[in-house]
Amino acid sequence: IIGVPGDDFIENFLDHTDLNEVRLAKEFIKFNERCFVRLLGDMRAYNYVVEMTPDFEQNQYRVRAIDFDQQSYEGRRSFYLPQFFKNNLPVVNLCTRLINPETSSQYQREERTLIKRRFNFSPTRIKKLRSCMCEDRISSDEKVRRLSNELGNLHKDSRFLKCETMGDISFLN
């Protein structure tokens, strides 16, 4: 796996003078959104890596998940947002210090737009994936109900209340 484990990055790289804090904060906000959209949970710092790519005088950063066993399983919305895990707090603090809420929302919209573009590029594959995910019962009915209620309230969308599987919720989210 290419990249520095998130917990090592936080401990050993976050205070480097050559760290481009704004780029890292922007990428973490986008990573947070990718996890939420995909319902990829348990993104504690040891479950992702940070790739650093030299780009002229600065580095580019890309945060990538490396543990997928908690995808579309839990019933709590916060479980799918890396910002709520204690060991990610130093990066979350960096984000809140450098990026205002409006800009953060813009990055989230940008990430959702990119995901939508990828979806539209492969409609046949997405249709097959959706069919498989919506038929599979990977979580308990109680967790499906709880998450559909939380996301319905968050998005102000009653369609979530009709979801019967985590696959249904994932594709609506």
Could you tell me what each predicted segment is?
Residues D8-F79:
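Conserved kinase catalytic-core segment
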Residues I1-D7:
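Short pocket-lining segment of the protein kinase catalytic domain that shapes the ATP-binding cleft
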Residues F56-N173:
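C-terminal catalytic region of ATP-dependent kinase domains
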